[in-house]
Swiss-Prot record:
Gene3D superfamilies: YVTN repeat-like/Quinoprotein amine dehydrogenase (2.130.10.10)
Extent of the WD repeats: 64-105, 107-146, 149-190, 193-232, 245-284, 290-329, 332-372, 374-413, 419-459, 477-516, 519-560, 562-602, 604-642
Organism encoding this protein: Rattus norvegicus (Rat)
A GO CC annotation given for this chain: nucleolus
InterPro entries: G-protein_beta_WD-40_rep (IPR020472), Quinoprotein_ADH-like_sf (IPR011047), Utp13_C (IPR013934), WD40/YVTN_repeat-like_dom_sf (IPR015943), WD40_repeat_CS (IPR019775), WD40_repeat_dom_sf (IPR036322), WD40_rpt (IPR001680)
One Pfam match: Utp13
PTM sites of type N-acetylalanine: A2
Official protein name in the record: Transducin beta-like protein 3
Cellular localization per UniProt: Nucleus, Nucleolus
Key word Acetylation present: yes
């Protein structure tokens, strides 16, 4: 069985996390700096800062209270970032260093819902859920204004772009816009024309015009000189954001007339440009295929010429403002990752299916993201053909799609098929060549789909008409949902796993039943063929993995160790080992021959639905319900090489230590013995040094020359020595040197020094009492010696 492959490959012993793709945006505000190089977005208790060019997370800013961030804003000069948390605290950040420059109470009686800087970057306005609007001077560090009068949550605040006019605009749940004068400390006007929540305010470059948008499907142009409505434009969608465009970007989009133009983003999921004077839509972004994605946010970075939009499923899209050409895509939050696969001939990309109709393709080196639209319901499973250019997906919309990546790394849908009557939950591609694929559905049937020869090549990724797929055969295979399919390496066999607790083996292409694998106590989540042996692996909700012989359908081995359902299993090390993932969030590496789990990997916090191994068998990718995607690297050889190097270094150092001890060069031997972690040898060296008449000076000089980590190790050794009355003198001698020559602040900085002192105190007191008693006894003996008087000898008898 797997023993034959084991002799040709090295067993794996460990995997290490090489890279993580984690959520960095979970809804709320997202903002670009003026240069367009950094992206700021909210993720729970943090504000994450991304490098737009590389997609890397530069820094995460989190307040000490660790409460959710309710609002934030970056100053126009890009120097100051202010965040507000649910704990009613405002934090002023030097965001480039990641440090808090100032922390103060918001004084609001409810969380801050909105925030905005003025054009000078000195004044900050905060709108609270308590209906109050406050203005702060962040340079002089005091509150300047407090405005009341808004009913309910103030969800929108904005300063007039001309700082000399000292005007502040706010909007609350009453759908009106209030204009506040900072100079008079009063409300100048209340603009009432919307019939639903106002979602955004935008100002013209001359400061005389303001545009407001709302969920009442209208945008209103206001004259700020008279505070009257200039134009009401029906846009026929609930608008979440609108932006007044500078003249140059509007003309670049093919708009012929001059004048004010504005862009809207809303529940239709497309960007549209409107002419303010006529109220006509002059540009409509082409609609993407698939389910419509509502846009929840839109902002323009004028200096950088970039437009940032956010979709309802937390994807962030960057457009070039002049042409509205898509520049970058970021997947802020993948929700529950249902499947993940390597893509490309060199496994340079990964595909991710999550709780969304959209697929996400990441380039592993740069984490550049492509968002693929096509399915109209949640994508459930993925599989990749052997060469890596072509892959397939299936979804709850009862359809399947074929996608191809071209040499430039761009992915497009090339074929589509439908025919199942329920959600398509699993899909599997042919292994030898791109000839067919198999799908399994909740309708308990399996369909075989031959691939047409007219598919585009890898040199192109056409967005033209999709090629229709036709099912060649349909077979009812199980009595319950089919959860997994696997095609054998020679494309001759098909394995199916179902909720009915059985796996079945079928002959292809006729879909003829060959046998049934029975033995699991609960439904099966995954089935996999061995790449080298005639063996099938099954993973079940009963927490076990079983290996089955294809010849007689008998169970060869059972692997137990997961505390919950085993969701995925994969053969690694040329079929000699198994890698499994479970709903307990753990990955386990099993050796088939010994039937043992050699390593348990814990990096996920919830179910691990996706597991796939690379072509070279040196990497694995996992995705789970915790929205994490983790790239694992096989570090067995690296760890073995590191261990071998350590052993060789230990041998060399041990020989050097033996030579030093033989030559009685104790001072040099002390540091070497400490680095080798040899407490007994260190004790022997100190005892030898103390036998020297000049022991105190030599011991002090030697100990003080040690590095800090060596002193920490020596202190740990002293704890052990101090427990023994025969060795306590050496421990006390070392301790005395450290206490006499190290400042208390330096000692407290030692690793574990508090615990060390607590361990030293009781034995030191015991030794002190014992030595005190010994000294008293010796003093008493000395006293007796000096005070003893011999009685006179008796006189000799007289001689006769």
């Amino acid at each position: 069985m797997a023993e034959t492959a084991a002799g040709l490959c090295r067993f794996k012993a460990n995997y290490a996390v090489e890279r993580k793709i984690e959520p960095f945006y979970k809804g709320g505000k997202a903002q670009l700096d003026q240069t367009g190089r950094h992206l700021f977005c909210v993720c729970g208790t943090k504000v994450n800062i991304l490098d737009v060019a590389s997609g890397d997370l530069i820094r995460s800013l989190e307040q000490e209270d660790q409460e959710d961030i309710t609002a934030f804003d970056l100053s126009p000069d890009d120097e100051v970032l202010v965040t507000a948390s649910r704990a009613l605290l405002l934090a002023q950040w030097a965001w480039r260093e990641g440090t808090v420059a100032r922390l103060w109470k918001a004084i609001h009686t409810a969380p801050v819902a909105s925030m905005a800087f003025d054009a000078t970057s000195t004044l900050l306005a905060t709108g609270g859920c308590d209906g109050a609007v406050r203005v702060w001077d962040i340079v002089q560090h005091y509150g300047t204004h407090h405005f009341r009068g808004s009913p309910g949550v103030v969800h929108l605040v904005a300063f007039h772009p001309d700082p000399t006019r000292l005007l502040l605009f706010s909007s609350a749940v009453d759908t009106s816009i209030r204009v506040w004068s900072l100079q008079d400390r009063s409300c100048l006007a209340v603009l009432t024309a919307h019939y639903s929540a106002v979602t955004s305010l935008s100002f013209s470059e001359d400061g005389h015009t303001m545009l407001s948008s709302g969920r009442d499907k209208i945008c209103i142009v206001w004259d700020l000189r008279s505070y009257e409505t200039s134009r009401t434009v029906p846009v026929f969608e609930s608008v979440e954001a609108s932006v007044l465009l500078p003249e140059e970007p509007a003309l670049a989009l093919g708009v012929k007339n001059s004048g004010l133009h504005f862009l809207t983003a809303g529940d239709q999921g497309i960007l549209r440009v409107w002419e303010a004077a006529s109220g006509q839509c002059v540009y409509t972004q082409p609609q993407m295929s698939g389910l419509r994605q509502e846009l929840t946010h839109c902002t323009l970075a004028r200096a950088a010429g970039l437009l940032l939009t956010v979709t309802a499923d937390h994807n962030l899209l960057l457009y070039e403002a002049r042409s509205l050409q898509l520049q970058k895509q970021f997947a802020g939050y993948s929700e529950e990752v249902l499947d993940v696969r390597f893509l490309g001939p060199n496994d340079s990309h990964i595909i991710v299916a999550s709780n969304s109709p959209c697929l996400k393709v990441f380039e592993l080196q740069t984490l550049a993201c492509q968002i693929l639209h096509g399915h109209t319901d949640i994508v459930l499973a993925l599989d990749v053909f052997r060469k890596g250019w072509l892959f397939a997906s299936c979804a709850k919309d009862q359809s399947i799609r074929i996608w191809r990546m071209n040499k430039a790394g761009q992915v497009a849908c090339v074929a589509q098929g439908s025919g199942h009557t329920h959600s398509v939950g699993t899909i599997c591609c042919s292994r030898l060549k791109e000839s067919f694929l198999v799908t399994g559905s909740q309708d308990c049937t399996v369909k075989l789909w031959p691939l047409p020869e007219a598919l585009p090549s890898k040199n192109t990724a056409s967005d033209g008409d999709l090629i229709p797929l036709q099912a060649q055969s349909t077979q009812r295979c199980h009595d319950k949902d089919i959860n997994s399919l696997a095609v054998s390496p020679n494309d001759k066999l098909l394995a199916t796993g179902s909720q009915d607790r059985t796996a079945k083996l079928w002959a292809l292409p006729q879909c003829q039943l060959l046998g049934v694998f029975s033995g699991h106590r609960r439904g099966l989540w995954n089935v996999q063929f061995s790449p080298t042996d005639q063996v099938l692996a099954t993973a079940s909700a009963d927490g076990t993995i079983k290996l089955w012989a294809l010849q007689d359908f008998s169970c060869l081995k059972t692997f137990e160790g997961h505390d919950a359902s085993v969701l995925k299993v994969a053969f690694v090390s040329r079929g000699a080992q198994l890698l499994s993932s479970g709903s307990d969030g753990l990955l386990k590496l099993w050796t088939i021959k010994s039937n043992e789990c050699v390593r348990t990997l814990d990096a996920h916090e919830d179910k691990v639905w996706g597991l796939h191994c690379s072509r070279l068998d040196d990497h694995a990718i996992t995705g789970g319900s915790d929205s994490r995607i983790i790239l694992w690297k096989d570090v067995t050889e690296a760890e073995q090489a590191e261990e071998q190097a350590k052993r060789e270094e230990q041998v060399i150092k041990q020989q050097e230590l033996d030579n030093l001890l033989h030559e009685k060069r104790y001072l040099r031997a002390l540091g070497l013995a400490i680095s080798l972690d040899r407490p007994h040898t260190v004790l022997t060296v100190i005892q030898a040094i103390r036998r020297d008449p000049e022991a105190c000076e030599k011991l002090e000089a030697t100990v003080l020359r040690l590095r800090r980590d060596q002193k920490e190790a020596l202190l740990r050794f002293c704890i052990t020595w101090n427990t023994n009355s025969r060795h306590c003198h050496e421990a006390q001698a070392v301790l005395g040197v450290l206490l006499r020559h190290e400042a208390p602040e330096e000692l407290l900085a030692y690793d574990g020094v508090r615990g060390a002192l607590e361990a030293l105190l009781p034995y030191t007191e015991r030794h002190f009492q014992r030595l005190s008693r010994t000294l008293q006894a010796a003093t008493f003996l000395d006293f007796l010696w000096h005070n003893m008087k011999l009685s006179p000898l008796p006189a000799a008898p007289p001689a006769l």
